[in-house]
Amino acid sequence: MKFTESEKLHQEALEHIVGGVNSPSRSYKAVGGGSPVAMEKGEGAYFWDVDGNRYIDYLAAYGPIITGHAHPHITKAITKAAESGVLYGTPTKHEVTFAKMLKEAMPALDKVRFVNSGTEAVMTTIRVARAYTGRTKIIKFAGCYHGHSDLVLVAAGSGPSTLGTPDSAGVPKSIANEVITVPFNDIDSYKEALDRWGDEVAAVLVEPIVGNFGIVEPKDGFLQQVNDLTHEKGALVIYDEVITAFRFMYGGAQDLLQVKPDLTALGKIIGGGLPIGAYGGKKEIMEQVAPLGPAYQAGTMAGNPASILSGIACLEVLKQDGVYERLDQLGAMLEEGILAHAKKHQVDITVNRLKGALTVYFTKETIVNYEQAENTDGEMFARFFKLMLSQGINLAPSKYEAWFLTIAHTEKDISETLQAVDRAFEQLKQS
């Protein structure tokens, strides 16, 4: 494959856009550098770049594009919105329809509020939890990403259940001191944190199924134990379902795992590809939000008709029979093939898969927490990524990210992908 136009475009972008990208995850820094491929068109399971190369896409825009690119039902809804005016600054009937759909999907949502991104949704759930409890500290799990607000750009401290340290320049230490970071799937460390700071904790922020250091499921009983211990201390449980909602099951991870949070943050899939976020939860907690309560949150673009209509259309597609069974079937086919080729070429990998999403780790170890994911072979992944890209398979350029299947993928796409995996593993072993 030739990437001449992508390389030219990246050089031009560097002159005008910071780092040449509008999100650092789009750069190729984590896979050894180089010019990121610039895409020009998406349709179904495929991308075409500015050089005319075609790719089978497993990035899915980091998760939102579960229906495939340019799904006709969603495209029709967006066109309708464009023709009717994309922004009013007033209530609309569509936002009521969409709120009802989210509540029907997730019974933990008594009340809902729309925002513009997953970052906003998480940020606001924390504010609401603090308003409701009168406390300030938050517990999060190491390696879990909850957006780029100061409140959650916090890394683990010097050991389990410690106060965090800023994970970005510009985040004050005073903010990091309000965040306690513990290892995921480690209930003893969680108990230790609550024993030490429980009376100061407003909420625990949880990815019920981790999606940001790969796909990592909670151990049996872990989430329920977290719920029970948190409530014993008078704190709230916030589920960050920005990735997981409507990805593994229509009702989200909380339905799949049969656990119920106090507050939920949503994003990605619920916009059908357009910018959106939402948060919701128990009525008495959500009534802390203005104009009913003292916790302020607002947004010019919040609930805009384009994103709302796109989201409604997306959920209408996902509510059809057999969607999640189909994603699981394709995911199993992909996982089995990857493992078979790894065994054939004696390449050490572990695959974590849940239905239509999976992560390939270059390690023999079973991954259940961030420390293990961090210790996987990033150099080997970088080589694998570039070998796959050169064969027309588009993956996320990071060892921590998932492969996301869409309902547009076919068995033929999986077979073509596995042929590329076979050749990539062969070259990795030879070199």
From Swiss-Prot:
It comes from the Bacteria. GO terms for cellular component: cytoplasm. Its cofactor is pyridoxal 5'-phosphate. GO terms for biological process: protoporphyrinogen IX biosynthetic process. SUPFAM superfamilies: PLP-dependent transferases. The keyword Membrane does not apply. Belongs to the class-III pyridoxal-phosphate-dependent aminotransferase family. HemL subfamily. This is Glutamate-1-semialdehyde 2,1-aminomutase 1.
